[in-house]
């Protein structure tokens, strides 16, 4: 029983960390613009697919991984500059619809370019599992967890110890006041999209050796990342990561102990529960009406 529980726990924490990275991407853009970016899932897909493409093209793995983060970050910037900035001041619903359209475009382009097939990426440090109290833990899972911890620490330092980070925080609290004290909020939005896309791509790269990837994986990963952001408290960075871990663990436990047929339904049952009973999330969002 313990071994089985640990196996489900390891699986849930691994995929939950990926949801957490996706949720961080949602949080960054939401804080900067009050927009929920439904193209976030496609950045996860893009990171994994580009990593596969670059490695198959013969590039060393470290170079392939860097490019697979850099390219989606550039795509995120282009999305902000070409689709969001021209309609600055539009209704929030309009901006959300634009991100949905961008999601469809990205998915279609990757389908045409790399096909409909499923692709794999070699694990970063081998595939020999480690035994832990009767359960098995893959080395790639440690990469996912370790990188997620590093990202959380790096973002904490960025937002609390750097001027650029503090400018982004100030904008998230009060955009008008930030502009009045001279903060370039357009630059903040620019950076938010770049960082959000990079975080999504990083999550996709990390999880691809475990779950494989294809042109359409971003839909469900993005939606579950959004669930994680809401569960943790929309606008709360640490809550986004913890929400991702919770969603991943509940999903794995439900699939293991109830039925795998309900695996994808569990996060959406959870978000309905949260919206009805805890609309600000477990750790408190910025305000209940914005959730």
Short names for language-model regions:
Residues 1-21, 50, 61-64, 90-95, ...:
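Membrane-interfacial amphipathic/re-entrant helices at transmembrane-helix boundaries
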Residues 48-53, 69-75, 102-109, 147-156, ...:
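Hydrophobic core segments of alpha-helical transmembrane domains in multi-pass membrane transport
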Residues 19-21, 59-70, 190-200, 204-271:
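Transmembrane alpha-helical segments in multi-pass inner-membrane proteins
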Residues 23-32, 75-76, 80-81, 102, ...:
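Alpha-helical transmembrane segments of polytopic integral membrane proteins
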Residues 86-161, 188, 253, 258, ...:
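Transmembrane helix-bundle core of multi-pass membrane transporters
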Residues 10, 31-78, 82, 87, ...:
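Membrane-embedded helix boundary and interhelical linker motif in transport proteins
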Residues 15-16, 136-214, 232, 237-243:
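Helix-loop-helix "hairpin" substructures at the membrane interface of multi-pass membrane proteins
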Residues 26, 59-102, 109, 242-247, ...:
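Alpha-helical transmembrane segments within multi-pass membrane transporters and channels
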């Amino acid at each position: 029983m313990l071994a089985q529980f640990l196996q489900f726990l390891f699986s849930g924490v691994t995929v939950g960390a990926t949801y957490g990275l996706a949720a961080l991407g949602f949080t960054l853009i939401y804080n900067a613009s009050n927009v929920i970016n439904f193209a976030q899932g496609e950045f996860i897909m893009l990171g994994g697919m580009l990593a596969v493409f670059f490695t198959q093209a013969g590039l060393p793995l470290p170079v392939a991984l860097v490019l697979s983060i850099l390219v989606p970050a550039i795509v995120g910037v282009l999305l902000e500059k070409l689709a969001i900035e021209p309609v600055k001041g539009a209704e929030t619903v309009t901006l959300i619809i634009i991100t949905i359209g961008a999601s469809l475009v990205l998915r279609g382009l990757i389908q045409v370019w790399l096909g409909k097939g499923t692709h794999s990426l070699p694990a970063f440090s081998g595939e020999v599992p480690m035994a832990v109290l009767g359960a098995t833990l893959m080395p790639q899972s440690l990469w996912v967890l370790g990188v997620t911890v590093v990202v959380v620490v790096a973002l904490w330092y960025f937002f609390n110890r750097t001027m650029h980070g503090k400018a982004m925080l100030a904008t998230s609290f009060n955009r008008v006041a930030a502009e009045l004290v001279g903060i370039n909020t357009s630059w903040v939005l620019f950076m938010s999209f770049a960082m959000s896309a990079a975080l999504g791509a990083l999550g996709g790269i990390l999880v691809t050796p475990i779950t494989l990837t294809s042109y359409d994986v971003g839909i469900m990963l993005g939606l579950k990342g959004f669930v994680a952001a809401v569960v943790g408290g929309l606008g709360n960075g640490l809550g986004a990561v913890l929400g991702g871990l919770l969603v991943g663990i509940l999903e794995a436990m439900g699939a293991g102990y109830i039925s795998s047929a309900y695996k994808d339904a569990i996060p959406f049952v959870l978000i309905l529960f949260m919206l009805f009973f805890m609309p600000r999330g477990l750790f408190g969002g910025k305000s209940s009406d914005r959730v």
